[in-house]
């Protein structure tokens, strides 16, 4: 079993929840092609501005992959402006394992996460990625921090 951190926006998190599917752009095919049924995916929602406030990055749920990767170009995901008009065609079906009542504050965990080697420039471990494999130890730390 492999553990994944899947990086998304608040808008696309709502779609994941509604449709039980994870999708990525074509350029991330190498990462998603390694996802197998039974793998566990943590959904990480990026920091965003809400009015004058900043809502920090958070982990909101755990899902299990229940399909192999498949291609579907229907436009269910919202592409951020910097990505143009991508459809996120590479997808995997999901089964919810746990949707956290209160999202996990990701920044509080950074000092203890093994996959983040540079704690000061931690965003570099996530920028430009749709998803990344994480160690089981980090998966357990994140999920044990949830309610």
Curated annotation (Swiss-Prot):
Coiled coil: none annotated. It comes from the Archaea. InterPro entries: EVE_domain, PUA-like_sf, UPF0310. Pfam families: EVE (PF01878). NCBIfam families: PRK00809.1. Belongs to the UPF0310 family. This is UPF0310 protein Kcr_0474.
């Amino acid at each position: 079993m492999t553990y994944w951190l899947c990086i998304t926006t608040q808008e696309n998190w709502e779609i994941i929840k509604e449709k039980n599917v994870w999708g990525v752009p074509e350029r991330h095919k190498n990462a998603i092609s390694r996802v197998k049924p039974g793998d566990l995916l943590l959904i990480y929602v990026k920091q965003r501005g809400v009015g004058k406030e900043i809502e920090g990055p958070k982990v909101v749920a755990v899902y299990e992959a229940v399909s192999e990767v498949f291609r579907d170009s229907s436009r269910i995901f919202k592409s951020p402006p910097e990505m143009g008009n991508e459809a996120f065609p590479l997808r995997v079906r999901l089964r919810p394992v746990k949707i956290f009542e209160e999202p996990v504050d990701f920044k509080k965990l950074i000092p203890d996460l093994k996959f983040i080697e540079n704690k000061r420039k931690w965003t570099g471990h996530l920028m430009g990625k749709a998803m990344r494999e994480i160690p089981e130890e980090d998966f357990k730390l994140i999920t044990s921090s949830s309610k």
